[in-house]
Amino acid sequence: MHSVSLGLRPAAVTQHHGFYRGENAVGRPVAGALSTHLQYAFSFPASSAFGKMFPTSYQGVGIAYYTFFNHSAIGSPAAVYVFQGARIAQLTETLSLDYEWNFGVSSFWKPNIAVGTKVNAYINAGLMLSWRPLPEWNFSAGVDFTHFSNGDTTLPNVG
């Protein structure tokens, strides 16, 4: 099975450093974000060994664009990543609890004290309720956690 998906992910940004609370060159907080994701996924055929072992698993590649509504202070990064997800529990005939993780690289940051480099690792993990009214359609909503990291390649690196 092959699929293409488009998703929007609104987010709150943790205020763990003064930079995010507005102590930046622009003087405005970085409190929220919105990202758009385009993903291509595939699943193994049900008749294959992997399809039999992992019948609800899917994997693929994705691209994302982020806005933090404060381009001058932090930039508007984009990410390229691989992802994998699967069902955790089937709740009803059409509703399930699923997970997904993403791992890749992000770029187009404006270097600053919080995000010290233009290129960073992108890590994401989430839980979703997925509603499948028809076999060809899937609607998901959930919560996830995203972390961008330069791996201490540039200091200071307050995250």
Regions found by a protein language model. Name each.
Residues M1, P45-S57, S72-I74, A89-L97, ...:
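Short loop/turn motifs that connect adjacent beta-strands in outer-membrane beta-barrel proteins
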Residues H17, M128-G159:
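Predominantly the C-terminal beta-signal and adjacent terminal strand-loop region
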Residues H16-E23, A73-G75, K110-A114, G151-V158:
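Outer-membrane beta-barrel translocator domains and adjoining extracellular loop/strand segments
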Residues V30-T36, I74-V80, T117-I123, G159:
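Residues that define the transmembrane beta-barrel architecture of outer-membrane proteins
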Residues L8-T14, F42-F44, I63-F69, F103-W109, ...:
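Transmembrane beta-strands of outer-membrane beta-barrel pores
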Residues M1-A31, S35-S43:
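Short glycine/proline- and aromatic-enriched beta-strand/turn motifs that initiate or cap beta-hairpins
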Residues H2-L6, S57-V61, V80, L95-F103, ...:
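Transmembrane beta-strands of outer-membrane beta-barrel proteins
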Residues L6, T36-F42, V82-I88, W101-V105, ...:
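Residues on the lipid-exposed face of transmembrane beta-strands in outer-membrane beta-barrel proteins
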